UniProtKB/Swiss-Prot annotation:
The keyword Hydrolase applies. Gene3D superfamilies: HAD superfamily/HAD-like, Trehalose-6-phosphate phosphatase related protein, domain 2. Keywords: Hydrolase, Stress response. This is Probable trehalose-phosphate phosphatase I. GO terms for molecular function: trehalose-phosphatase activity. SUPFAM superfamilies: HAD-like (SSF56784). Pfam families: Trehalose_PPase (PF02358). It comes from Arabidopsis thaliana. Its EC number is 3.1.3.12. Pathway: Glycan biosynthesis; trehalose biosynthesis. Its cofactor is a divalent metal cation. InterPro entries: HAD-like_sf (IPR036412), HAD-SF_hydro_IIB (IPR006379), HAD_sf (IPR023214), OTSB-like (IPR044651), Trehalose_PPase (IPR003337). Removes the phosphate from trehalose 6-phosphate to produce free trehalose. Trehalose accumulation in plant may improve abiotic stress tolerance. Belongs to the trehalose phosphatase family.
Length: 369
């Protein structure tokens, strides 16, 4: 992705090393946990101070990025290139996963398919109020059938409790807070031999009090901005600006930055009409995907075929991990061309459901081993 498409701002004012919380009793002694250390260099420190204290030009750059975070039309093109040509070119590079279904299944032959699904914009439509992003009963039934056929995980920026209240399927893996809160299926619900029932991993456990305090301060600071909505996702916080008047965006940027100045070990990232505040550790949806594959026994093997479906910038870490791994692929959910590491595309949650249904039908037609 280009820099304008994948902005990560680290709000840092001190050099530090943050260790992984390996003393957490929730970690299984037999589970090989990936390292989770981050060192902040002096060069990065100075750069982050500049970001925090930047003037109007820096704020304008953020506002421009906010406009681009949820495109509603094709990006502007040179006059010599038509929008249809641009769309056709993008589709050639990221063809429909429905149209290429047989080709995808051929690539998976002889391998264990493992499914990873984002929630908002993938299993449910994007809505103005994140508390009303309900999954349809048809989608729930489809995902339930999918989990009978393949190990299946929900990987989301939401906290696990909130997304579980939407999905309500105990047989799934859940990776909430952008993968910083991972739980396995409820005891007795998994149909897959490799699943570890006691799986629980929280690499940012030490940050819980800090996130609670940031949430409280953001709630207070942004209450003067109509339409702003602050959420606590347990291991990260978010500020939604989908319902904020564009004239108020600069004000909102200042409010968020004024809070983060006090918390040097947190970073600010941007998704679709939302700011995400999370711990500055080497952990994202891509790392969560790696951890889950390791937990399933597929850490160092080539007989697995992971499929990740998502619509947001934060899903790009998972897409890139799969591309670098050279196994499986990512599917971007979008009606508009975007820079992405995904291999295929689907337009909206209805197409996602169609793709998942075809996967279930394909699996049911395979001879039992």
């Amino acid at each position: 992705m280009s820099a304008s498409q994948n902005i990560v701002v680290s709000e840092t004012t001190m050099s530090s090393i943050i260790p992984n919380n390996n003393n957490n009793n929730n970690n299984s002694s037999s589970q090989k946990l990936p390292p989770c250390l981050i060192s902040i260099s002096k060069k990065k420190l100075l750069k982050n101070i500049d970001i925090i204290n930047g003037g109007g030009q820096r704020i304008n750059a953020w506002v421009d990025s906010m406009r681009a975070s949820s495109p509603t039309h094709l990006k502007s093109l040179p006059s010599s290139i038509s929008t249809q040509q641009q769309l056709n070119s993008w589709i050639m590079q990221h063809p429909s996963a429905l149209e290429k279904f047989e080709q995808i299944m051929e690539a998976s032959r002889g391998k264990q398919i493992v499914m990873f699904l984002d929630y908002d914009g993938t299993l449910s439509p994007i809505v103005d109020d994140p508390d009303k992003a309900f999954m349809s009963s048809k989608m729930r039934r489809t995902v339930k059938k999918l989990a009978k056929c393949f190990p299946t995980a929900i990987v989301t920026g939401r906290c696990i409790d909130k997304v579980y209240n939407f999905v309500k399927l105990a047989e799934l893996y859940y990776a909430g807070s952008h993968g910083m809160d991972i739980k396995g299926p409820a005891k007795g619900f998994s149909r897959h031999k490799r699943v570890k029932q006691s799986l629980l991993y929280q690499p940012a456990n030490d940050y819980l009090p800090m996130i609670d305090e940031v949430y409280r301060q953001l709630l207070e600071k942004t209450k003067s901005t109509p339409g702003a909505k602050v959420e606590n996702h347990k291991f990260c916080a978010s500020v939604h600006f989908r319902c904020v008047d564009e004239k108020k965006w600069s004000e909102l940027v200042l409010q968020v930055r004024s809070v983060l100045k006090k918390f040097p070990t947190l970073q600010l990232t941007q998704g679709r009409k939302v700011f995400e505040i999370r711990p500055m550790i080497e952990w994202d949806k891509g790392k969560a995907l790696e951890f889950l594959l390791e937990s399933l026994g597929f850490g160092n093997t080539n007989n697995v075929f992971p499929v990740y479906i998502g619509d947001d910038r934060t899903d790009e870490d998972a897409f890139k991990m799969l591309r670098d791994r050279g196994e499986g692929f990512g599917i971007l959910v979008s009606k508009f061309p975007k820079d992405t590491d995904a291999s295929y595309s689907l337009q909206d949650p209805s197409e996602v459901m169609d793709f998942l249904r075809r996967l279930v039908e394909w699996k049911q037609m395979q001879p039992r081993m």
